[in-house]
Amino acid sequence: MDQRHHPQQPLLLVSTAGDPAVKVDIINGLSGYEFSRLRLIASVGSTVVWTNRTAVTQVVQLNDRVIRLAPGGNDGATALTRFSESGQILGRLRSNRAASITFFITEEFKL
């Protein structure tokens, strides 16, 4: 088919899976317990799936929210949170105060 007569349309990606989900694991790192990621960009309405991959209970502090995760492999080792407004959120591990994760929350999801 001759492409000169059919201009290309921009590709539009549409998700039918619902809200975008972001996965963050707590792992045994080089400097102790840490997050599997340091920085994330997500949109308002995104869900974060937190999973504790360590053998001990972990507590995540997100601004004014606290998430308690049971040791990996046990009930309660995974938790879900959702971003309801835009901005920057800093998360810290109580078991390693040097471990942090920063979320940049935007109004819309960008690929």
For the regions a language model picked out, list residue spans one by one.
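Intrinsic-disorder-associated, low-complexity terminal segments enriched in Asp/Asn/His/Tyr and depleted
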Residues: D2-H6
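Extracellular/periplasmic metallocenter environments
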Residues: P7-G18, P71-L111
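N-terminal edge beta-strand
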Residues: A17-T47
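Short, solvent-exposed loop/turn positions at domain surfaces
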Residues: E34-S36, N63, A77
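Short beta-strand/loop motifs in extracellular/secreted proteins, especially
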Residues: S46, V56-Q58
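Asparagine-centered strand-capping/turn motif at beta-strand->loop junctions
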Residues: T51-T54
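Short, surface-exposed beta-strand/strand-loop-strand elements in extracellular ectodomains
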Residues: V59-R65
